[in-house]
Amino acid sequence: MDLNSIKTEQRNSRTAQIDTMSTLSMVKLISEEDKKVAAAVGAEAEHIAQAVDVIAAQLKQGGRLVYSGCGTSGRLGVLDAVECPPTYSTDPGEVIGLIAGGNEAIFRAKEGAEDDEALGAEDLKKIGFGSKDVLVGIAASGRTPYVLGAMNYARKQGAHVIGISCNPGSQVEKTAEIAITPTPGPEVVTGSTRMKSGTAQKMVLNMLSTGAMIKLGKVYGNLMVDVKPTNAKLVERCKRIVCEATGVDYDTATEALEKCGYRAKVAIVMLKTGSDVHEAEQRLEAHEGRVAQAVGEN
């Protein structure tokens, strides 16, 4: 294996003397390199949009979004998955993050797990992965066996397969139905893909899950109307969302939320249409959970 041909493993000439720099110069240089990430992700907008549409369509049909990755890439997938239930009230099994080596690998590296191609497929089998689901394989280098094993298995099931890597021409790119390949260049510390590559992957994952949830009607304007208020901060956010969406005062928003079990969507429809809880629920159901349509704005 020639790692020199992999962009994420190449040496960054701009940071070759970073160990001799002052702390301020070092930090500024890292920041300058990080600025390349957003542009690299932006260059993949068309592919990201295609992936969002596929994910939203499959979730609407009862499929699941499954991330597969190793190390940093795997942890980023897990992070994105676990944030979906509180943010968008998704079922915990609707967006799933799989990491080579299992849950222990989230906190401590499991040596050799990423090199097991069969394990990638086996982890999909364990969750009953099928044709309605979508797999997103995440690997900075684009060559990780665990991820490729998962991607190949998913393709055999007839599922949509999306690949995220930071190395053009990689095996992940070739295996994916939709390849997303932001290329921010060699890392500040050679081969440390938790840095620019990891940031690029996190940005892409944000777009995939957020974009899909917006397409599914879980956002009204730019308000998080499907938030699950599981703590004090989120309860207050829920109240502010209803106030922002309807123009009512804090007490009126609180009263409406208490009537409908703190479901912001239902409270907004109630207040905007003068309906009771049951009628608001029916309006939302008739319009696939989209608040704008439920209140007659679109």
Language model region names:
Residues M1-A40:
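Cofactor-/ligand-binding subdomain signature composed of acidic, glycine-rich
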Residues G191-Q201, L205, K228-I241:
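EF-Ts-like protein-protein interaction surfaces
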Residues A212-N298:
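Short, amphipathic alpha-helical interaction segments embedded in low-complexity terminal/linker regions
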Residues V66-V204, A212-I214:
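Glycine-rich phosphate-binding loops that contact phosphosugars or nucleotide phosphates
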Residues A43-Q58:
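A short, well-structured juxtamembrane/interface segment
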Residues S31-V37, I96-R108, Y220, G261:
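Gly-rich Lys/Arg/Thr-decorated short loops/hinges at beta-loop-alpha junctions or inter-strand turns
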Residues E33-A43, A109, V134-G137:
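Short, basic, glycine/proline-bearing loop/turn elements
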